[in-house]
Amino acid sequence: MRTDAAGGTYLDPSAADVTALLERVHLVGIGGAGMSGIARILLARGRQVSGSDARDSRTVLALKAQGAHIALGHRAENIEQFDGDPTAVVVSTAIRRDNPELVAAQERGVPVLRRAEALAALMADHRVACVAGTHGKTSTTSMLTVALQHCRLDPSFAIGGDLNESGANAHHGDGGVFVAEADESDGSFLVFAPSVAVVTNVEPDHLDHHGTAEAYTEVFQRFVERIEPGGVLIACADDAGAALLADQAEAAGVRVRRYGHEVTADGDARMVGYRPEHGSGVVTVEVSGDRLDVQVAVPGEHMAANAVAALLAGLELGAPLEGLLEGLAAFGGVRRRFEFKGRADGVRVYDDYAHHPTEVDAQLRAARPVVGDGRLVVVFQPHLYSRTAAFSGEFATALGLADEVVVLDVYGAREDPQPGVTGELIAESVPLPAERVHYEASFTAAAPLVAGLVQPGDLVLTMGAGDVTMLGPEILAEVERESGATEEDA
């Protein structure tokens, strides 16, 4: 047991009593991507689950239908939804220390678990595969999960996005394998002990928590040290940060498999070609002397690299090659990862979660072949004041790959505003003619603005980790209103 500065009781997730605590569980912020996944698995395992969230949502309604007792708003009495106190309260890093439910749990001596600690306890008695990296975690974890499902291995999984196939971000399976997205943002992935660890890339981010790029890199080094004896690190050799990790791990005696364009060792996956197809692609890979064509059902070379990582991880988990290839070809994508939202008057609208300059760059390059003869119109909402201040120039450069850019104001999430840090900081540096770059501080004015800019054949891409995802349907409605035409989704 340990106590933090706020007086909360925390437990070592490797201890046997942590799993025993997950009987009557209250989750603060249960509607979030990570917390809802834990709730789904607990419910599937027959545990009692209560929770709270700031607002109603599709996720909250789905969890209620599964049997969770959920209150809207945060109040101390919300933890009293069981007969007696909960056996544990689970919180995410988004929950402030003065949250009344967290305070009530601390005052009553109810054990408090961080989200990752609860997830680690759910992994007990499973062979664990964790996917980490600055970018590509959700897509790679999802590809691996779907590929294993096609091999009929029925993995348990917890992902930071909803699979389009099932609409779920988590599942309790009977296959003895647990696949999880490992979030480095607060360092909490250090509680996991995977036998298969994937690192897609390492590039400075979340400096609001880690402080420096060096500290951010160090937390990945510590994650690799958590790999179980006899386990394997799968790392992207094309990324400098991941390649350095791989070299360090190998020197420490960890078995390493690399993927990328220049790898040469037996067991590595060398990507020797990529052919884009409409809305998808094919990557040619050489592995242990075999040459494979891997069909990837989502566009972009970055997605092809993610698929190769998933392929190697699946092989390490004992899945058959043919089944993995079939699963990757059938992969239906993840919600908010270049997700098609609809079409109106010849204008297609997609939505994507990209919120780091490298992600924005990769997704715009992937979208370009899909655009065709029209224009690529991007609506970008910066996420976090700290990230906007640190990377405004890089964001501007990446957005210059579009034909028309609308930059919204910053979605602050957990952060307070910073003087002088707005979306305009990015917009004023986008390397496009001024008439093709628009800063719109009013969220409600964004959809009418975009509808007035687009023409038939254009592709609109809303982009960011905040509530910009809500704009897609509004843009479609505005386009229909202006044109007087309605088209069926395609």
UniProtKB/Swiss-Prot annotation:
GO terms for biological process: cell division; cell wall organization; peptidoglycan biosynthetic process; regulation of cell shape. ATP binds at G133, T134, H135, G136, K137, T138, S139. It comes from Saccharopolyspora erythraea (strain ATCC 11635 / DSM 40517 / JCM 4748 / NBRC 13426 / NCIMB 8594 / NRRL 2338). PANTHER family: UDP-N-ACETYLMURAMATE--L-ALANINE LIGASE (PTHR43445:SF3), UDP-N-ACETYLMURAMATE--L-ALANINE LIGASE-RELATED (PTHR43445). GO terms for molecular function: ATP binding; UDP-N-acetylmuramate-L-alanine ligase activity. It comes from the Bacteria. The gene is murC. Cell wall formation. Keywords: ATP-binding, Cell cycle, Cell division, Cell shape, Cell wall biogenesis/degradation, Cytoplasm, Ligase, Nucleotide-binding, Peptidoglycan synthesis. It catalyses: UDP-N-acetyl-alpha-D-muramate + L-alanine + ATP = UDP-N-acetyl-alpha-D-muramoyl-L-alanine + ADP + phosphate + H(+). This is UDP-N-acetylmuramate--L-alanine ligase. Belongs to the MurCDEF family. InterPro entries: Mur-like_cat_sf, Mur_ligase_C, Mur_ligase_C_dom_sf, Mur_ligase_cen, Mur_ligase_N, MurCDEF_pg_biosynth, UDP-N-AcMur_Ala_ligase_MurC. Its EC number is 6.3.2.8. GO terms for cellular component: cytoplasm. It is found in: Cytoplasm. Its main location: cytoplasm. Pathway: Cell wall biogenesis; peptidoglycan biosynthesis.
